[in-house]
């Protein structure tokens, strides 16, 4: 769900990459309620997927 662009694609702004070097990139702040039930469910789902990944990774290295 990220909005990354592939190499060589343009977004309509024809600026050289070095032109924005002097500008600071402002990072968007998020206010996440860590006690919300949907946040807890999301965290459990992410942790579950990560554990599966770790198990698969460990199995393929042996």
Curated annotation (Swiss-Prot):
Residues 39-62 form the IQ domain. GO terms for biological process: positive regulation of CAMKK-AMPK signaling cascade; positive regulation of neuron differentiation. The keyword Electron transport does not apply. GO terms for molecular function: calcium ion binding; calmodulin binding. Functions as a modulator of calcium-binding by calmodulin. Thereby, regulates calmodulin activity and the different processes it controls. For instance, may play a role in neuronal differentiation through activation of calmodulin-dependent kinase signaling pathways. Belongs to the PCP4 family. Binds to both calcium-free and calcium-bound calmodulin. The affinity for the calcium-bound form is 50-fold greater. Mostly intrinsically disordered, with residual structure localized to the IQ domain which mediates the interaction with calmodulin. This is Calmodulin regulator protein PCP4. The gene is PCP4.
